[in-house]
Amino acid sequence: MSHGKQFTLFSLKPGPNGWHVAFILEELGLTYENVFPNLDVTAHQGPEDLVKYNPNGRIPALIDHGNNDFVIWESGAINQYIVDRYDKERKISLAPGTEEYYTQLQWLYFQASGQGPYFGQLVWFAAYHPEKPQSVLDRYTNEIKRVFGVLEGVLSKQEWLVGNKPTVADISFCSWNEIITTTVLQNFNFEKEFPVTAKWHKKILARPAIKKVWDERAKLLAQG
């Protein structure tokens, strides 16, 4: 490790997915170096320096130098790998093999399949697509609100998604929720429309490790 860190994390400064991996690493006190490849979000193929680690050509991808330079990509799989291997005290995760572990996994799958793609599609059509078809914008906006409704229904009955404590499942939602509610959705009041979910989100965002990483992102974006 020439940089002296245990992990190399390929990420994207404005995008959410690499940052919620960084959240997990920071929560567990694991050292890592962020690498930001020259990724054109409108391109169909990633740059060579990323494709050699992730054949999908997208971020995030993680190299674990403490485990024979093992490479893993897809944020849900990365987060699961990190907590399974390194969260031995179960600070932010549940023990493998337990029922709660599979509930945690359920929420990670929901984040990856139910939150990320729909939130990302709204960003694409709102910010990058040459046309702005209102029917498409409405579809993804409504789907985002549906996802928030799922979270609201569950969190109205319990403080955290699983295990009566904040876990990787809760944290994995944070970066997309923050980006979509502060910079993308129009005429949207998070606290008014989904008060329980908004409160839950703010508690996660205020955690010292999460705040540290998100502040780092803000500084990088400010630098251009």
Where do the model's predicted regions map?
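Active-site-flanking alpha-helical
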Residues: V83, W176-N177, W214
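C-terminal helix/juxtamembrane-tail motif
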Residues: I210-G224
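GST-like domain detector, emphasizing the conserved glutathione-binding G-site
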Residues: S2-S135
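Residue-level recognition of oxygen-bearing side chains
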Residues: A77, V196, A209
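Positions that flank functional sites
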Residues: L39-V41, P166, K219
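GST-like fold's C-terminal all-alpha helical module
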Residues: W107-K202, A206
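Phosphate-coordinating loops and pocket residues in cytosolic domains that bind phosphorylated ligands
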Residues: K52, A206, D215
